[in-house]
């Protein structure tokens, strides 16, 4: 489902994040106090509560609008969840014209603002108090599973009550662990730089950044700050952890920093554990931060007063070479004091202020004295022009204070050499101005981002229109609130790398403008001071507009410098592009891994479905087989019952027929015996008839009795026979049933064995398919990683070469400026030498006149003409010799200065070339090491996958062998149990038969009955009984 359009509030969850009111009606008196890649931060007052707040305006239009919108939503969600004394307080958020207004708690400044104002490191107790507040805030964040990922002095804010606040959560991670490339380069932990290559990281990256911040507060800049930011990344990833010099700091502080900067995250303590460190818990004053803030405010006020006096001096005093030179000297000293500060101390993430000056300014400061001191005379003369350029821009400021939305006034007509000439600003000594070379606007000498090695020797081209010099007044506030919590506090507030630390404050500050002269309206009022009532005009401007005295320890020059540096987007775009590329790489990799995961899940689901279908088919087949067996058993039981009944019926019918035949034969025999007995008796006539009748009757009775006995015996025999045959039939049928059950069991077990073999074959097939998919997915992931690392290395090399080209071009420009300025400097020195020559000539002329007068007083008058001629010739000879000496001095000076300049430039070029080559070599070595580690990781992952596949195959085979063995055991057990059951049933039947009077042998004899086949029809069976007649029914001689 595609993401919603940036700024759309159709989603109720997103709409709930923003207030529905118009922020321009709620907040007033907006004053810009910070600037960065996200936009700007403003001081403001709420009309409803009269509360002072800071507003971070973030635009989500232009390139990557969807990404900007998601970043805004993430920061809002993050801030809404925080509730801790050491995190910035969230006030609300509004939407207006494609811009999000993020309203937060207002703070007076950041730790970087303090070192920027004082131009010197903080004390250990002050750093410890700041660390305690930071650790408390970090411990709270880490307990919620959050990571800040951009801890630095510029993001550590202070309130008027001395409470430390963590700000700028634009780079924060909502989940822990994380693995994205986010943060400010100089403060990044090694595991963040290597996040994509070596896995994830946790909240201990904030502990590393805190350690770097401690070094920043102790040395005014973080390690590797004189390097290109890209180069710093490679050094952080490869080199050992930075340390503090133990001679300058206590053991507890050095130990604390050393623990924070443990290279291995596992050895680095957590933020909660560091809260118990001796450095943080040792006794100190409870008001150490309050005193620091008060001292900083006092220093800022001193800066205001000093610069106000300078501005008044510029406006009120007529041009004077001596005064101008003094003023220019002060300005140059101030420029030197803040020279390195042109380089901001952070290249922030998308939500941090990005601002990086040219690092060559700080890395090449060793050549700052390569231009001869004589060249500075030119700049003493040029100070007046700087002051005029500054005064020409002041009028617009006061006017803008009344009308902040109006356009600035048009430029005044240009004077000589293209310099702007404000009305009433033409000096009485304008004839001298026409002979002076063009000089730069004071803006360039004070706050140019490209700080030259020798600020006294580089004079940029004149500006076509007056530009306001950036004042260092107590203007709003911290680094980009930034200072209030968002984005980019670091740039404005960090002190840069100014080498001037120590000495009186007045010698270490930049010339600034009072806070009440920061607007065009105020400047316009000050311009009126060039008239006779200038002093009254300045007082009126101050009274009318007030001192803008809202609480802050941030100077106006920081804000102005942020705005100027943000205009130089090249380095910002380069670093932002690099971060964006790393994030895109991470997103592509995550997307591919998610796709692989989804494909694997779908693959496993398909395989599981196929296997489940097979098992379901197996179950269905077994159920069908069991049903068939059950039906077969029931059918056979019915057949057995029917066969038993039929056999009983047939035997009964046969026996009835036998009895009928027996009765018929018995009657025949009885009749035959009766006739025979009658014949035999009738032949014996001697026996009386009565006796013969009695004898016949007796024989008849005996025969009937015998026949009755025979009949009874036959019935008993038939009964025993039918019972025996039925027992035999039942026994045989039981044996047949047992055999049939055995066959059914064998069929079932055979079916199960066949199914088990099919299941195992399918499992092996699935294993092969899964293995093939895993290898294919791993190959695609490895290929993507390799392509990404190659692209990343190409980008890094391209960025490094761009940086080298930029440094070389800037060095060439600097040398060209030095060469252009050299004739001016040499001309000034030549003029000084010629002036000395003229003064010497005047002195010698005076001495000659006095000497001539003395000689003529003692010389006779007739010889005076000759003496005068000789003295004149001597004078001409000495003056000629003196002129030649001065000309030779000028030539020697030209040659010496040219040689020194050439030599210093060659040395500077050589050092710069060596430094750039060293950085390129470090980058190449880092990339080679990175490639080697990446290849080793891929090989290791490949081996691990092969091992996993092999182990899985082994486990699968072991499982199949175990299942087969279990099946064999189950089959043997079931066969055994079935055999035992049948044996017991047969034994019980035989015992019952014995109890009924049947012997086992008689039961196992072959039956004389023809049983129907088990599968055949009982109707087709024939029962054949042995032939029986009456003669066989009686034993021989029974008659």
From Swiss-Prot:
Reactions catalysed, as given in the entry: L-seryl-[protein] + ATP = O-phospho-L-seryl-[protein] + ADP + H(+); L-threonyl-[protein] + ATP = O-phospho-L-threonyl-[protein] + ADP + H(+)
Pfam families the UniProt entry points to: Pkinase
PROSITE patterns named among the record's database cross-references: PROTEIN_KINASE_ATP, PROTEIN_KINASE_DOM
Keywords (A to Z) from UniProt: ATP-binding, Cell projection, Coiled coil, Cytoplasm, Cytoskeleton, Kinase, Magnesium, Membrane, Nucleotide-binding, Serine/threonine-protein kinase, Transferase
Regions annotated as coiled coil: 631-765, 835-993
UniProt PTM comment: Autophosphorylated.
EC number assigned by the record: 2.7.11.1
Main localisation: cytoplasm
Active site feature: 150 (proton acceptor)
EC class (word): transferase
Record membrane topology: Peripheral membrane protein
Compositionally skewed regions (Low complexity) per UniProt: 359-376, 388-397, 413-429
Chain residues that bind ATP: 33-41, 56
Record field: compositional bias (Basic and acidic residues): 677-693
Annotated tissue distribution: In the posterior midgut, expressed in almost all intestinal cell types including intestinal stem cells and enterocytes (at protein level). Maternally expressed, ubiquitously distributed in the egg and early embryo and enriched in the germ plasm at the posterior pole of the early embryo including the pole cells.
Compartments where found: Cytoplasm, Cytoskeleton; Cytoplasm, Cytoskeleton, Spindle; Cytoplasm; Membrane
Residue stretches making up the Protein kinase domain: 27-280
Requisite cofactors: Mg(2+)
Compositional bias ranges of the Gly residues kind: 485-500
Compositional bias segments (type: Basic residues): 377-387
Domain of life of the source: Eukaryota
A single GO molecular function term of this UniProt record: protein serine/threonine kinase activity
PANTHER family per record: SERINE/THREONINE-PROTEIN KINASE TAO1-LIKE PROTEIN, SERINE_THREONINE-PROTEIN KINASE TAO
Listed name of the protein: Serine/threonine-protein kinase Tao
UniProt organism field: Drosophila melanogaster
